[in-house]
Every structure is written in C-alpha cells, then in structure tokens.
C-alpha cells in the first residue's frame, strides 16, 4: 500500500475527506521527524516505536575492491513494530515472502 492508497483507505474508514486525511498524515510525518530530530522517541503503544539510536564505529569493506575501511559512528533511526503489527503478520506464510 502506498501513501495515496493509505489516504483513501483511512478516509473511507473514518468518513473524513481525503484532503483532511492527507493533512493529518503530513502533520504526523512532520511531528515525528521533528521529534526524532530532537533525540526523542515516538511511541504508539502496541503499534509502533520510532526512536533515534547510536551506531558505534565499525570496520567494513568496499565490496568492489575488497579494501577495508572504517565506518564512522553515526545516529540512525530504529522503527520497531508493536504487538498488534506482530500479531497481524503471524498468519502470513513464509513461502509467500521468501525469494
């Protein structure tokens, strides 16, 4: 499902207009981004957790040249599913997703 499809589905489910849902989703993206940029987490209990995480320096290599290199420490974003998302995936078959 892409963003447009999500907006249509939420609009149908809530009986809101697609314009209202689009504004709400844009606001959610903006506020989530600003919150993570401040170093805080966004927690939708039981559904989703988004937070900044520290990544330590590590050794890596260039796959084309096999040359070793040092990867600098950085800050990334962790997105973890809550129980409701995990349970939603329980009924799926592994074979449908394995390639």
UniProtKB/Swiss-Prot annotation:
Residues 52-77, 90-99 are annotated as: May be involved in preference for HM-URA DNA. It comes from Bacillus phage SP01 (Bacteriophage SP01). One of its GO terms (molecular function) is DNA binding. This is Transcription factor 1. Residues 61, 93-94 bind DNA. Belongs to the bacterial histone-like protein family. Selectively binds to and inhibits the transcription of hydroxymethyluracil-(hmUra)-containing DNA, such as SP01 DNA, by RNA polymerase in vitro. SMART domains: BHL. The gene is TF1.
């Amino acid at each position: 499902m892409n963003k447009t499809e999500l907006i249509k589905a939420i609009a149908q489910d809530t009986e809101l207009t697609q314009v209202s849902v689009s504004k709400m989703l844009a606001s959610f993206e903006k506020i989530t981004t600003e919150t993570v940029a401040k170093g805080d987490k966004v927690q939708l209990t039981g559904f989703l957790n988004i937070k900044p995480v520290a990544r330590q320096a590590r050794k890596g290599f260039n796959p084309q040249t096999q040359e070793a290199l040092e990867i600098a420490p950085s800050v990334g974003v962790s997105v973890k599913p809550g129980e409701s998302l995990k349970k939603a995936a329980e009924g799926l078959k592994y074979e449908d997703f394995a390639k």
